[in-house]
Every structure is written in C-alpha cells, then in structure tokens.
Amino acid sequence: MPHLMERMVGSGLLWLALVSCILTQASAVQRGYGNPIEASSYGLDLDCGAPGTPEAHVCFDPCQNYTLLDEPFRSTENSAGSQGCDKNMSGWYRFVGEGGVRMSETCVQVHRCQTDAPMWLNGTHPALGDGITNHTACAHWSGNCCFWKTEVLVKACPGGYHVYRLEGTPWCNLRYCTVPRDPSTVEDKCEKACRPEEECLALNSTWGCFCRQDLNSSDVHSLQPQLDCGPREIKVKVDKCLLGGLGLGEEVIAYLRDPNCSSILQTEERNWVSVTSPVQASACRNILERNQTHAIYKNTLSLVNDFIIRDTILNINFQCAYPLDMKVSLQAALQPIVSSLNVSVDGNGEFIVRMALFQDQNYTNPYEGDAVELSVESVLYVGAILEQGDTSRFNLVLRNCYATPTEDKADLVKYFIIRNSCSNQRDSTIHVEENGQSSESRFSVQMFMFAGHYDLVFLHCEIHLCDSLNEQCQPSCSRSQVRSEVPAIDLARVLDLGPITRRGAQSPGVMNGTPSTAGFLVAWPMVLLTVLLAWLF
C-alpha cells in the first residue's frame, strides 16, 4: 500500500482520550479487475523523505499538502510593526490574502515586511509543469541584497499559485516577503483562497470557488480522502472536484459493504462531499476487530456513477480505532446485557444513561445474550455511563442499587448493594470504584442467591444526575449514614438488569416473579438472604 495515501487524523472527544484514525489506500477498480492501482514511481512533482531515513518512501504532492499563510504583514509595502523572524518555519507553505500570494523576485528594502532583513526569491518562479524546483532566497542587509541566503523549493500548482518549502532563516530577524496582489485581479473577488482544484467564478452575481471544468485525472492517489472518527458515526470526506476529474460526476452513488447502506453524497464546505457509517458492530456490514486496547471498525466506501456499473468503481477502504472503555465496548458488542433510560433535566435537555454487566475489572468485556450464568465464586462488575447530555457539567450518581429475587423493581425483598449513594459496609465483597465523580459509575460484588427457592437475581439501580456546578456530587459516606432508614426510591429513574442465575442450576423457571419448585437447595456461600435480612441493612 503506498504510504502516499496514509493519513492520521485526531478527533478530540469528551468521552475519549484519543481517537486514532487510519485511512487506507483509495483504489480505482476497472470492470473485470480487482487489483488496486499502485504507484510504481514518484516524479519530480512529489516531495519525499530524505534518503536513508524511514520517511524516504513517504511521498506527497505539496500542491495538496501545505500550510496556508494569510499574513498581510508580509507585504513588501509594509514598513510598520514589530520585527519578526521566520527561523522556526519548516514545511510547505502557500501565501494567501491581502499581503500577497508570491514571494518577491526583486530585492526588498530593509525594515519592510515587519522584519529587519526581508527575504526575497533570487530568480523567477517556475511554471506549471516544471515540478519542484530549487531556488535561492536572499536577505537584504547592510547594503547587500544577498547578505544572507538559503535554499528553498518552489512548485507551481494548478490554480495559478505557488507553494514554497521553507526551512527557517539563516539568522534573525529575517522574514520571507510577498508582493501584494492587484486588487482588480479575479482571485481577490473570492473571499477565501481557492484550492488547486477550484477556480474563482461568479454565479448569479456572487463570486465563489467552484470546481474547475478542465480537471481530468487518472491519478487516484491525488484523491486523498479525509476521515473523521466520531463517537456515533464515521465520516469519510472526498474532494468533489477531484471526483469529477476521475469521471465521477454530480449524480455519483455511494454505498458501503452492505449495498443497502447507500446514499447520495452529502455536501460539505469547500466542495467536499461525505458519507457516514454508524459506529456499530452490525451496521452496514462493518468489520469489527478487537484487541486488548482498541475496537477497530473497518468498511469500504464504493463510488459509482449509476446502479448499473459499466465504467469505473472507486473503492475507499477505511478504518477507525477506538480505545476500549465502557461506551466503546458496549458499541462493539453484538448483544450486550444492557439497560437504557432517558432522563430529562429541566432547562438542560434530555440525557441517556446506560447500565451493563461486565466480566472483568476493566469494564471493557460486557456479558452478552439474554441472561447471565455465574459460578459460585464469580464477581459481577456493573458499570453505568451517561451517554448523551452535558457530560462536562453533570456527573452520574448511583443513589440506590439493590438486588431482588424477581424482576419487579418494587419487590419488598431487597438486598441493598448501594444505599443513599454509599456501599453496604457489611458486605466486604462490594467495591464501589467510582460514583458521582464523572459521567461514569462502577461497582463490583460477589454473587449470591436468595433463600426461599428463588432461582434468579435481578439488579436495579436508581440514578441521579448531579449538577457539578451547584451540587456536591461525590458521596461522603459514614457508618451512621449507611445505617439510615430505608430510602424512598424513585422507580422512574431505576435501571434494571438480569436475570442472573448460578451455573449448573436448572434453566430459569421464574420470569414473572413466581418461585420455581426446583430452586437452589444450598445457598451460595457469600450470603443467605431472607426477607428479614433484606430490611436490616
């Protein structure tokens, strides 16, 4: 796979510390051929890493990979302002805006361009088709137009502009200077600088950047799609102008690995178009790969001109890797045992809270299926997360978590694991890892059974959304608080999980709250719960 098409994109999310996105090769496949087009060599119009380094084989077109410099102070007519220096510049740059779009080709007076010694290009700029050319940039000082000098690379790009590879300056204060543009030129009529694939045109008396009509390219590697790995969807963005150059016109059809997941490309800013894929294991035939640290979603975006494929198909393979946490692990599970609750907070919108059962202390491996079957010594991990809403302001608090022998959350037989936001201190197997500190809460408990021939255990948690700006969210627990009266529970804010049964027991015979005639004969060693004990805590 040519490294030219590799691109890493970071996406800062409230609920993820890091999102790693990898865009694989975009390949055009002609009818009857399944092999992607490979780049066998790189010409003079591509910039590659230094020979002998790991980046030696990484090449790209600087006309499509540069930093915009919209800095009016670089104008050769500017004789005011503080004295700046470009010593720390490194990479490919394009000058835009009122200050000018090209470096000066003649010696510039000292103390112009907001610097002491202005730098100018000694020679003429290359023409389109010349590729990347080597030039000398000179700095005017002490009566010498080339008192300091350094090498720069320049390339002429489609669209009538140049890009420059600048690696600092020989001294300070030196700065690269540009010739201000003529305000009457067409380029100045567009508020934003047009990209190489665009031209500045007037449509209905309004100037803007539109796709060039003369684009005709067979180089699929110039497409360079962009990838945005979001919390709920993956977005692939493609340059609309370059699609047109590859023969894919306005009515292009897009579909993922599941042909039923098809749609017309959505229009983005600056002549880009996009298609989204949900971050779900079973959606649109996503391929889900999972290791110890990440869940990786893969799919392929196919672009064609018609449902009847006669010409070119453009396939874009993409993947997003998400660090595993509670939320990502639930998305990656096909059938997690999970409970959801919509909660409205006056003046702050609607929130979604989810609670699930996990198999380990990392809370990244949820139980799946219809029920959980555990051995005697098993520890059950319970995690809850505030998924939707203002998680920067509201913290999730588990006020009361309790077990019942039936699925009825109002069952009189209750064993409290958490009461009044504090853990049951009489049960040494209960560990509350987090409660009220963030948008997540989690606790663990060794499993048990109820006396009285009940086969099943159900878990229930009453939640509270705590406004961290106006409330003390983290519980302050003491033994006197733990022994307080039985709390009043708001059943409208209770999440339910279960049933849970002991491994080796008969199939659950109770789903409606009626005890099975074939109940457990021996209580699990953790605790033997009776109706009386349920109310003692």
From Swiss-Prot:
Segments for region (D10C): 61-81
Domain EGF-like: from-to ranges: 186-230
Annotated segments matching region Flexible ZP-N/ZP-C linker: 322-345
GO (cellular component) term, any one: endosome
Region of interest: ZP-C: 346-484
Keyword Signal: yes
Protein name: Pancreatic secretory granule membrane major glycoprotein GP2
Organism: Homo sapiens
